[in-house]
Amino acid sequence: MDNRGIGYIDSGLGGLTVVREALKQLPNESVYFVGDEARMPYGPRPTVEIQKFTLQMADFLVKKHNIKALVVACNTATAQALPQLRAYLEIPVIGVISAGALAGINATRNLHVNVIGTQSTVESKAYYDQLIALNSDLVIEQKALPEFVQLVESDMAGTPKGKQIVYQAIHNWMEEKNDGKKSDTLVLGCTHFPILKKEIQAAVDKNVAVVDPASEEILQTAEIMRKNNAFHDSKNINHHEKDVFYTTGNIGRFSKFTREWLNKSNLTIKELHIDQKGLKE
C-alpha cells in the first residue's frame, strides 16, 4: 500500500474533468492538482516552452507533496512532453492520448474517427499515430479548435453564444463524408472540451459517440496502482481532507469553477507564483 497522493497537471481548468473521473474511480486517493492558467493556452506555444512549463508543474508536485504517480490531464502536454516527464521522474506518468485513442477505437462502429484538440496536439499527429497503431484500417480526421479552450476559460460554457460557436465549428465538418461514410465517433482531444460536452453532442448527429478520454486514463492509472500495490490503505479511507488544488491564474475564478465542477464546497485552493526557478506558493 502507498498512502501518498496522485498528482494531476493541466494548462488550465480542463484537467479537472480528469480529476472528477478520478474521484469516482479512485475515491480513496488524495488529489494534488495544478492548473497553469497564467500561461494558457499551451496549444500555440513552442514545444520547448510546453516542455518547460510541464516539467515545472511536475517538479512542484513531486517536491511539495511527494506524489506516487503523475496524471498528465492535458493532451497538449502529453503530446509534447510525455517522454521528457518519464525520463525526469521516478514515478509512473500516465498520459491522456493513448487513453483517448483506445476509447475512440472501442467506440467506433464504422472505423471513421474524428478528433478535435488544440493546434499543438493536432499538429503533433499524436492521436493519429496512436489510432493507426491500434487499427490501420481507420479513417481519421482532425481539427484544431483552440477557441473551445477560450470558451471554457472565459466561463462561456452553457451560454447561447458558446452553443453557437460550438455548433458552427463542428456541425458541418462532422456531416462531411470520407470514403462514403460520416464519422460515427468524435474524440475530445483536449481535457477542456468535456466541459462543453452538452454543446458538442447537440451539434453532431445523435448517433455519434462523443468520447471523453478521462475515464480510460483513470482506468489505466488504477491498473498501474494495482500492479504496483500502490493503492491507498483501505483501512484508512481517504475523505480528501488533504487534497490541494493550485492555480497560477485568477484564484477567485478558479475556486468558483473547481467547487462547482467537482460539487465540493470545502476544498483547499491555493495560488502559485511563477519565477525563474519554476513554481512556488
UniProtKB/Swiss-Prot annotation:
One of its GO terms (biological process) is regulation of cell shape. The keyword Cytoplasm does not apply. Keywords: Cell shape, Cell wall biogenesis/degradation, Isomerase, Peptidoglycan synthesis. Gene3D superfamilies: 3.40.50.1860. It catalyses: L-glutamate = D-glutamate. Provides the (R)-glutamate required for cell wall biosynthesis. This is Glutamate racemase. It comes from Oenococcus oeni (strain ATCC BAA-331 / PSU-1).
